[in-house]
Structure formats: C-alpha cells, structure tokens
C-alpha cells in the first residue's frame, strides 16, 4: 500500500476517535455559542459535523490537490450557510478549527512515529505542510464566505428598516400618505424616491400627502431630493401635497430656486388630511 493510501486509511479509521476527543476537550463559556453543549442532541450533532469534516479532509491524501481543494471548498461554503454557524461569533469558529488542526496534527505525528520507515526523506514535512495548508484554506474560506453572508443579511435588514421608515400609507382609494421622519441621507433619499414611485404606481395613487414635520435636519441635498420626488410623481400623474414645512426647509428651497407654484402646501398634517376629505 502506498504511503498516501496508508494515511487515508489511518485517518479514516480514526475519524470517530478524533471527533470524540474534540468533543471531550471542548470548553465553551458562551451559552449562545454553537459549541455550548446544552444536551445530548446538540453534542451528537456537533460530533457528526466534526466527523463529516474529517471525512472530507481525508480526501487530501487520495485526490489531486486542485480537485480536492475545489470539492472541499464546496463543503466549507455549505457550512458557512448553516444558521447556527452564522449566529456564532466567527472567532469561536476559528478557535475550533485551530483546535481541530492541533488534534489532527497530533494524530499525524502518531502515524509518522508508527510508520517512520515508510517516509522518504522530506516526505513527512511535505504531508505536514499540506495539512497546515488545508486548514489555513478552510479558515480563510469560512471567514470569507461568513463575512459575505453577514453583509447580505445586513443589507436585507437595512432595506427592511428603510422601507419601514418611509411607508406609503393608503388613506383612500386614490389618496396615500408618506410620513417622513428622522435624518435623510443620500442612501435613504434614493430609496424613498424609488419606493414611493413604485408604491404609487402599483396602488394607482392619484394624490400623495408628504408630511415633513418629523424630518430632523434638512440640508440642500434633502430639499433637492424631496422636490425631485415631487417632480417624478408629477410625471406619473400623481399630485402632491406638502405639509409640515418648517422655515429652514422653505429657506433652503428658495435658495435652490425650487418652484412651489404647482404644489399644494398645508401648515400641518391635520390640515392636509382635512383638505382631502
């Protein structure tokens, strides 16, 4: 039997033993971590995941390196999509990969000691270097894709927050309300424009009340975006009524040379609602 086949057979035979040792030496103080051994079911799930990790890892001895890394990468990426791994701080996952590396290296040293005569000069170091390389590859791949998943989740949450912070509320068959509150930055202004136009077109809104009384700060950019929205609404046949315009908003609008002549303006939202009843 060739050396690589012996290594594959040795590590395949010790999968259960290594997984058991990994679990037995685990110390996790964070109760919310994936690695907190709450009960027998959780423990067995983790152990099976570790067995699976070793089974995939062991193919490094019998597959061409390029093919092995491509197939192994697919498994690691699949692992990063596991919700429990996503919910666990990445430093904990890295810590366990490093513990696995130390454990795996220990078993490699054991094999090398028992089969010293099977190694050609420099061959032991070659396999030891490959083990380190594969574990480094594992950690890098996991961190890279975990970060990508985290960004996707963050973007989804941000979009949800943006949508909730600028809702188009239906008041009647043809009238709706857009209450704007808080700070408006460039990203939010762009979302408000796109979301409002889509919502009005979809609901066949003919008249939109835009209330600005909750907007904290109004600078030149914000004022420009608000009136850009009004112009865009006009192009799709939606008339706009503004309410809650504070003096600083009016001043900024005048400085920008914005034309109010085609816009209905009311002092507050109550007046705007009464106007359309």
From Swiss-Prot:
PROSITE patterns (alphabetical): STAS
UniProt modified residues of type Phosphothreonine: 186
Entry-linked SUPFAM superfamilies: SpoIIaa-like
PTM entry text: Phosphorylated by RsbT.
Signal peptide: none
Domain of life the protein comes from: Bacteria
Assigned keywords, A-Z: Phosphoprotein
Entries under InterPro entries matching the protein: Bact_StressResp_Reg (IPR051932), STAS_dom (IPR002645), STAS_dom_sf (IPR036513)
Assembly: Interacts with RsbRA and RsbS in the stressosome. The stressosome probably also contains RsbRC and RsbRD.
PANTHER family named in the record: RSBT ANTAGONIST PROTEIN RSBS-RELATED, RSBT CO-ANTAGONIST PROTEIN RSBRC
Role according to the record: One of 4 functionally non-identical RsbR paralogs, it functions in the environmental signaling branch of the general stress response.
Protein name: RsbT co-antagonist protein RsbRB
Source organism of this protein record: Bacillus subtilis (strain 168)
């Amino acid at each position: 039997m060739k050396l690589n086949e012996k290594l594959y057979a040795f590590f395949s035979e010790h999968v259960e033993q290594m997984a058991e040792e990994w679990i037995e030496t685990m110390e996790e103080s964070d109760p919310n971590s994936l690695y907190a051994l709450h009960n027998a079911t959780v423990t067995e799930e983790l152990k099976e995941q570790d067995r699976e990790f070793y089974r995939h890892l062991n193919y490094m001895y019998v597959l061409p390196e390029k093919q092995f890394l491509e197939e192994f990468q697919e498994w690691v990426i699949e692992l990063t999509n596991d919700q429990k791994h996503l919910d666990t701080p990445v430093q904990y996952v890295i810590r366990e990969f490093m513990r696995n590396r130390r454990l795996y290296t220990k078993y490699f040293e054991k094999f090398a000691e028992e089969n010293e005569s099977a190694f050609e000069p420099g061959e032991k170091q070659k396999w030891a270097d490959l083990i380190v390389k594969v574990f480094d590859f594992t950690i890098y791949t996991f961190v890279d894709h975990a970060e990508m998943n985290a960004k996707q989740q963050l973007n989804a949450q941000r979009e949800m927050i943006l949508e909730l912070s600028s809702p188009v509320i239906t008041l009647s068959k043809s009238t709706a309300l857009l209450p704007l509150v808080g700070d408006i930055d460039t990203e939010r202004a762009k979302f408000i424009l796109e979301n409002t136009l889509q919502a009005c077109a979809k609901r066949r809104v003919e008249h939109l009340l835009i209330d600005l009384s909750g907007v904290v700060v109004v600078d030149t950019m914000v004022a420009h975006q608000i009136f850009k929205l009004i112009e865009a609404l006009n192009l799709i046949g939606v008339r706009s009524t503004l309410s809650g315009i504070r003096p600083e908003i009016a001043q900024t609008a005048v400085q920008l040379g914005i034309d109010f002549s085609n816009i209905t303006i009311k002092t507050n939202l109550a007046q705007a609602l009464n106007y359309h009843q």
